[in-house]
Amino acid sequence: MAFRHQIVIIAQPVGKMKSPPGADCSKTRRFLQARGALAFAVKLRYNVGAKGGNGEMETRQTKQTSAGRRAALVLAALLLLALLLCALTMTRVYPAMPEALQVLERPADGVTVRRGAERIDFIPAHPQAGLAFYPGAMVQFEAYAPLMERLAVRGVLCVLLRMPGNLAVLNPDVADGVQADYPEITRWFLGGHSLGGAVAANYLEKHGGEYDGLLLLAAYSVADLSGEQLRVLTVYGSEDGLLERDRLESGRALLPADAEEVVLPGGCHACFGSYGAQPGDGVPTITRAQQQEQTADLAAAFCLENAA
């Protein structure tokens, strides 16, 4: 009886995501390409068959060939791992600014901050709507604390979600179960910044009936939500140097017909969060605080209107 080993390497794609939106993306592409190459599957199949009636032993040459294939497979895996580590080294993580971390220690009056291992909740005294938020790629998620606090002051309970490796694509279903923790809130929205917004939109392609709307900050959808019963608000700055305008344009056709879009005069890509400047972004003509205040006004009005 002979055993024949067949080793098949299958490259697995990262997912259905197209080029992620915004600035986080240029540095993230190397990571995603390396990750896609590394995420391979090895199938080892043992084919058992009788050859006549005398039992056939594997020849020395076959053994050597199998050993050579295994060695080549191990070498390929090591090379791919080295490529991934190199990509990670080249990818910068944007840390939260001190002002963002201070919000977590001393939130505004009427706002309670509840910190968990995988998320931070910003809870108003009388929440009227809920927002689960996906941060941008390679940004320390605490950097969005000032914006979340501003929304909570306006009556929107915000759940800021932590992403593994600071990449939403590595855990796109992180919003699962968020609503169950606050059963008293009956209207929920999903939002995200840049790549986080695109991943949030992808999530709603499968979970659209669970949310009332989508908030896209400097982001566009690559998922077809045109047939969903969702309200959508897109907000971006006039000086954003990282949001791909052609993708934004083509993404409009994927949104419901009544989707809203607002341009913040003088706003940039990075100032939705509090993590400093990003290479390639435009020069804002308004302050970070002003951009976040205007965004909070728009987002709160959007959520609370739909929660009425």
Language-model-detected regions and their locations in the chain:
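Short alpha-helix in the alpha/beta-hydrolase fold that links the catalytic acid
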Residues: 147, 243-253
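N-terminal membrane-anchoring alpha-helices
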Residues: 57-110
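Short beta-strand/loop motif that positions the catalytic acidic residue
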Residues: 234-236
